Amino acid sequence: MASSQVGDMVNGNAEPTRHLAKFPPSLWGDRFTSFTLDKQLWDKYGNEIEVLKEQVRSMVVAGGRKAAEQINLINVLERLGVSYHFEKEIEEQLEQLFAKFEDNEDYDLFTIALHFRIFRQHGYKMSCDVFNKFRDSNCEFKETVSNDVQGMLSLYEATYLKIRGEGFLDEAHAFTIAQLESLVEGPHLSSDLSEQVMHALKQSIHRGFPRLEAKHFISFYEKDASRNETLLRLAKLDFNQLQLSHREELCHIFRWWKELDLISKVPYARDRAVECFFWSTCAYYEPQHSVGRAGLTKIMLLLSVTDDTYDAYGTYNELKLYTNAVQRWDVSAMDELPDYMKALYRALLNVYDEVERDLAKQGRAYGVHHSKEAFKEIVRSYEIEAEWFKEGYVASFEEYMKNALVTSTGRLHTTSCFMGLEADVATTEAFEWILTKPKMVAASGAIGRLVDDVMSHDEEQERGHVATGLDCYMKQHGVSKQEAIVELYKMIENAWRDINEEMLKPTAISMKLLIRVLNLSRISDVVYKYVDGYTHPEIIKDHVISLFEDPIPM
């Protein structure tokens, strides 16, 4: 979160006191600087994948399967991480299944909850009234379903698709957590099922990083006696082939970042090339988005250093100069900047030029202008926070959030992510939609801002920092820190409800775009769930290694 941590020089030309953040260094050394893609292995995977894809496509479109079986097949494809190969076929099937759905009395809780989750994930608004038959006259869950671990687990995952006004799903969420925790502690679950439940309680499907969750599910599915070997084989091959591609991309990014050598000129900043690529891969992991991933990663890296400049190094006067330079977006503005800022400013202009050239080759450069404007907006808001800090000003919570929804990077990340999508998906209308400040982008930004405020609060206040949302709420409402945290988490949950509702049909823009906003929101849940995993990358180190280094045994 950006804010000036220091005042200006005390007198004359004396060097100002700078309250450095002392961020942890990069974990990776030269670990990702070299990688040679095994083209023979990549081709071998690819050839078998193409054969298996046709077999699975035939499964998806084949008739004669009961609705519950078809929904389960779609669920397995999604959880194995291979549904992106069959998007058209799956959407056609779901449209038919939703139109024909009947609340069959024979459907158990697992099946009803699975229908609910899959339909809502794809924009179909199934009513939560479908769960009424599992409650007694006192509106409590019947005992027969309370001890059904598969049913409870399915309902638990379904509750994450709730929207505003669905109090039943709030109750169901709390109830299923309590039941699942109790069942895990009991003696009746197999070790495999217990492991699956514990993972779900730690990370839900809906809010998880799709590629990481696919890898987890593959390990569970492999132990399932009813598994389909064709699906399992496809999932393993697909994960490993895509991992090779991602590793090669990461190597290119890592070398580019090392050659840029910006950190040596701004050593106060977080060195997070690998983590930014991890972030970008969550936004879109599919192989056709390699150019987009590279562009998004580079922009995120420059934003990260800019954030740290405002947050943990620059004086107020220096920051004003930098804000003005970014608004001008012209190399001549560099002359007015201190030396360390010149390096950052030059890198910023060059990165956007690189990204624009790469996208121009594919006829998609028109989005770059929107990303630049979003970057300018963030820097203006960073300066507002720097002024607040200099003046010791604690904003009202509403005033804080108005500015924080900009510094949360929701607009910039969404715009920069859209730049890397196909031209017929990320149209000029899509970028204009972002300019309307849509509820979904605001909700995504609120999630990121508020969860970061909670998780990084103590550390930031220890070194001196502008008042965060937590501080503003505490002062305005006269409540304790813990009480404020409870209220902020209520806001986070409401933001998730808004995201879910914005993804229900009819949607404002293509679902292919909205899923990217959802993915950007998921990053906050994964990276900031227990601590600020971006500032402290050891928290997500295992995720990075799992995603980019460790293949799935064949």
UniProtKB/Swiss-Prot annotation:
Similarity remark: Belongs to the terpene synthase family.
Range of residues in the leader sequence: none
GO biological process: diterpenoid biosynthetic process; sesquiterpenoid biosynthetic process
Name listed for the protein in its UniProt record: Valerianol synthase TPS1C
Position of sequence motif DDXXD motif: 326-330
Keywords linked to the UniProt accession: Lyase, Magnesium, Metal-binding
Cofactor note: Binds 3 Mg(2+) ions per subunit.
Gene designation per UniProt: TPS1C
Source organism of the structure: Camellia hiemalis (Camellia)
